[in-house]
Amino acid sequence: MADYRTLFSPSGTGSAVTVLVALSLLLLLSQATSDPCYDPGGRPRFCLPPVTQLVGKAAAPCSQTCALPADSPDPVCNGTLTLDLDGSFLLTSVTLRFCTAGPPALVLSAAWAIGGPWRPLWRRPAWPGVLGGPKKVTFHSPPGPKTRIVASYLRVELGGKAGLVTTGVRGRCQCHGHAARCAARAQPPRCRCRHHTTGPGCESCRPSHRDWPWRPATPQHPHPCLPCQCHPIGATGGMCNQTSGQCSCKLGVTGLTCNHCGPGYQQSRSPRMPCQRIPEATTALATTPVASRSDPQCQGYCNVSVSSVHMNLQKYCQQDYVLHARVAESAQVSASSSLSSLSEAVGPEWWRLAVHVLAVFKQRAWPVRRGSQEAWVPRADLSCGCLRLRPGADYLLLGRAAENHTDPAHLILNRHSLALPWRPRWAGPLRRLQQKERGGACRGLLPPTRSPGPRN
């Protein structure tokens, strides 16, 4: 059977008291550690550091008459006293104490810098017949956010003889409503900034929170600094410009938040380089032979003398046709056909090639249709190695329409044309060039004076 005396013993009572004390301490600790710049829900709010006694220095010290004998020949101070507050503060009150009767006239001014401009805070004019003023003068800053007084220097102008003993200045650090604590005696005073602000007076946003320009907090709106909305892949980091919010973008990336590719670039799958420059259609002539050197008649006959052609918009526009075709078969024909008018210029015989046009990337004036049709090649061009076509192979055919021919419907492949072994990767760039041509990009780009050739 349990002993009830043990349950209600003094030791049990002591444990309950200990628990109550611990709970009280936790409550006080939570209140002490609560942030005045945030409400209980974690939302930012306007906050100010506490009022403190500020320390000033006398730039033009006057005599302490209370420490001098009463019969001193000059026991009073007459002139101007300037106080350096060692920082920018919001003034709440200024107290002047005199050990003799105060001066009949007194002017209190404040300024941001030692040279002014000075703003009068309080003025007491001299009255006729009045020999002096009170021994203690206190100036209080008027309430309201629009009448706050921010000063780094104070100036006291004494309009008569008086013995000034002490000057008491009270105020709070100028934290622009973004801090509730401040090291007022530091030089310069430093606010413990909140709302993602930084600087001695919380006068700017952190580099990572510059989505909107910095603004001072008000009781109606705390104006916290918002994080930069930089794209995690397109931007070089999380920092943005304090004025515009522009993020620092990677090469080829543009936009306020670096979220899309710029002109001339296309999206890639690489997180390190998300936008890559759109490549020009590059075609290789590794399998296109040069002219035969054994036959003297072939020397300098062919136009093809290099191994690569870089197809850009200008060279594309200078072509009469750009085709993707497959060579099917060939048969020899005589020059007595309908193309006999050309036989004198390029040779006595022709080769007729049966080709299958798979795609038309640039259409000539006389349209070339997809499907099976004939292409005509001069025999001399084939024998000199200007064109080497293999049955069953796919080629990219580029060239200009033959001049002085009797049938414009025929597709002519001569020494000025290019027959390049087809590469599937060329289709995308060529389609983009075709879209630009349809949009009018080729207007004004006249064909060259001579037939298109490879890049030197």
Curated annotation (Swiss-Prot):
Disulphide bridges: 173-182, 175-191, 193-202, 205-225, 228-240, 230-247, 249-258, 261-275, 298-384, 302-386, 317-442
Laminin EGF-like domain residues: 173-227, 228-277
Q: Using the record's annotation, list all stretches that form the NTR domain.
A: 298-442
Is Repeat one of the keywords UniProt gives this record? yes
Q: Which Gene3D superfamilies match?
A: 2.40.50.120, Laminin
In this protein, the residues bearing a glycan are 78, 303
Q: Which SMART domains match?
A: C345C (SM00643), EGF_Lam (SM00180)
Q: In which tissues is it expressed?
A: Expressed in the olfactory bulb, the cerebral cortex, the hippocampus, and the cerebellum in the adult brain (at protein level). Strongly expressed in the subventricular zone,rostral migrate stream, and the subgranular zone of the dentate gyrus in the hippocampus.
Physiological role: Plays a role in neurogenesis. Prevents motor neuron cell body migration out of the neural tube.
This protein is called what? Netrin-5
What organism is the protein native to?
Answer: Rattus norvegicus
